[in-house]
Amino acid sequence: MSSSPNIGFISLGCPKNLVDSERILTELRSDGYNIISSYEGADLVIVNTCGFIDSAVQESLESIGEALENNGKVIVTGCLGAKENQIREIHPQVLEITGPHSYEAVMKHVHKYVPKPEYSPYTSLVPKHGIKLTPKHYAYLKISEGCDHRCTFCIIPSMRGDLDSRSIVHILDEAKRLVDAGVKEILVVSQDTSAYALDKKKENASKTVFWNGMPIKNDLITLCEKLGSLGAWVRLHYVYPYPHVDNLIPLMAEGKILPYLDIPLQHASPKILKMMKRPGSIERTLERIKKWREICPDLTLRSTFIVGFPGETEEDFQLLLDFLQEAQLDRVGCFKFSPVEGAVATDMEDQIPEEIKEERFHRFMQLQQKISAERLRQKIGRTLPVIIDEIDEEGIIGRTMADAPEIDGVVYVDNFSKVEVKLGQIINVTITNADEYDLWGEI
């Protein structure tokens, strides 16, 4: 039995929150704590919460309650932690509460209730790239915190603050450690990836810096070029449609980063986009998509949209459907508008009844499923590189360059017994079949 204190840990929410959890776990292990996956035997439990939408808030509150019931000693951090009063009202017995990315405060509270061990065997087991909660062959890389936009449906800036970009040197150093440790795919995340380093320009701090003895600029294009030189797949998420995003497409065409753009557009009605405080020129967006595909024919476009936003008429919704038909996006997520405490849109007039939201959601998804199915069918007969995520007796499950883990489709490979393969390996697969979301193929 180890003499090191045991810390239980619950991580909720998005990949950005997962990165925060990984950092806290790394610091816990570096300080000699043992991380366990159960309440029983834990000297303390940390719950890293999500507070983006009401369902996430409810899940976080329930997880806190479960930890209290089964253990009793609980520290809360994460996005919902920015609303301490809301947590205390339901769970007053929580020991301490901090907001998101409050790593030092979390560790200070842990030390207060469970003193740091004088010696622990776990301190020597921390890998150079830190503790990761993802499979060994891919990892999330957070490049900034916060967001300068004030979209009316979102409360992230009130929780995570304004844009705060990391140093390009620190990001590249972390990325190199990941690749050196065997990571084959780096998933770049933030609240607003395309805004990377724009805050430093405002502060006149975007000067040339040195990495590996060479001068480099502290900007998004340079970051992507350098990440692409490390030898791993590089996938960009949460890209706001700034004009300079156009400059990323040639890098994708050249194979420096994956030809994959996760660009949340949210709607297509100029009226609704204006109410959301989002960019409103859909004609311009369609022109850009056409140009992007001319430069990089293999480009995969993923986006997310909201239906049932306050004031959305049938005409507004039809504009959204028309846009989907014309844009022919590859991967699309759809959310029914959900009131969030603190969001401007929650108090707007003309809230849409739930039954209309539901009906529009289904119409949206029916159309997009047809589009996605047709775009996937176009891949039948092609031989594509596939990264292996799972291997079992039934076959291989992997992903193409067009598929991010968790949110996109997969490739099922049946005849894997003909060759020896391992997790994280990138193999060539000939596509034989497709449906609305997934592909099937053979080696």
From Swiss-Prot:
It catalyses: L-aspartate(89)-[ribosomal protein uS12]-hydrogen + (sulfur carrier)-SH + AH2 + 2 S-adenosyl-L-methionine = 3-methylsulfanyl-L-aspartate(89)-[ribosomal protein uS12]-hydrogen + (sulfur carrier)-H + 5'-deoxyadenosine + L-methionine + A + S-adenosyl-L-homocysteine + 2 H(+). PROSITE patterns: MTTASE_N, MTTASE_RADICAL, RADICAL_SAM, TRAM. [4Fe-4S] cluster 1 binds at residues 14, 50, 79. Gene3D superfamilies: Methylthiotransferase, N-terminal domain, Nucleic acid-binding proteins, tm_1862 like domain. GO terms for cellular component: cytosol. Residues 5-115 form the MTTase N-terminal domain. Residues 133-374 form the Radical SAM core domain. Its EC number is 2.8.4.4. Pfam families: Radical_SAM, TRAM_2, UPF0004. It is found in: Cytoplasm. Transmembrane segments: none annotated. It is an enzyme of class 2 (transferase). Belongs to the methylthiotransferase family. RimO subfamily. This is Ribosomal protein uS12 methylthiotransferase RimO. It comes from Histophilus somni (strain 129Pt) (Haemophilus somnus). The lineage of its organism: Bacteria, Pseudomonadati, Pseudomonadota, Gammaproteobacteria, Pasteurellales. The gene is rimO.
